[in-house]
Regions:
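Bacterial N-terminal signal peptides
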Residues: 10-20
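Bacterial N-terminal signal peptides that target proteins for export
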Residues: 1-10
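Beta-strand-enriched cores of mature, soluble protein domains
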Residues: 24-162
Length: 162
């Protein structure tokens, strides 16, 4: 009989802890926005296997605006493996958005060129500072060339803070 009471007590405690954990869980928030960027650095190396094939390292700066009105400074860099003549290529890189208080969100991206001047891919938060410490989230983006050294990306995804 005592064994049955212990099992019942453990079950009640486990159930209470489970309900508490569910209650304290933070649901991921759906977010979306646009990044407007200006290229400040571009270095490329010709591969030579076909005309226009290069490996490039770049740096962009700009503004990130969310659909909820939040804006941040944006910094982004990456490595591209692409053909400048055909537009075919892929890439990956890193970025940082910094809000007005100086808190930062760090993220990675990877994608591919889906047409001349248009890229599609995925992004994911890696870490954050200040109110973004412990950030989690990921999403998708489509990036468009707007003019020489100018581009913008429309993005959406999820953000979760502890």
């Amino acid at each position: 009989m005592a064994k049955g009471k212990v099992i019942a007590f453990i079950t009640v405690i486990t159930l209470a802890f489970g309900v508490s954990a569910i209650d304290n869980a933070v649901a991921a928030e759906r977010i979306a926005g646009r990044n407007v960027k200006h290229n400040v650095k571009w270095e490329q190396i010709e591969i030579g296997d076909e005309e226009g094939h290069v490996i490039a390292v770049y740096e962009n700066k700009g503004i990130s605006s969310r659909t909820d009105g939040e804006t941040s400074l944006l910094w982004e860099c990456g490595i591209l493996d692409m053909n400048l003549k055909t537009g075919v290529g892929s890439g990956n890189g890193y970025g940082t958005t910094t809000d007005k208080a100086g808190d930062k969100m760090y993220w990675t991206w990877e994608g591919k060129n889906v047409g001349k001047g248009t890229w599609e891919g995925t992004w994911a938060y890696t870490t954050g500072t200040g109110k973004f410490a412990g950030i989690k989230g990921k999403g998708t983006f489509t990036s468009y060339a707007a003019a020489p050294q100018q581009s913008y990306s429309d993005w959406e995804g999820e953000l979760e803070l502890p």
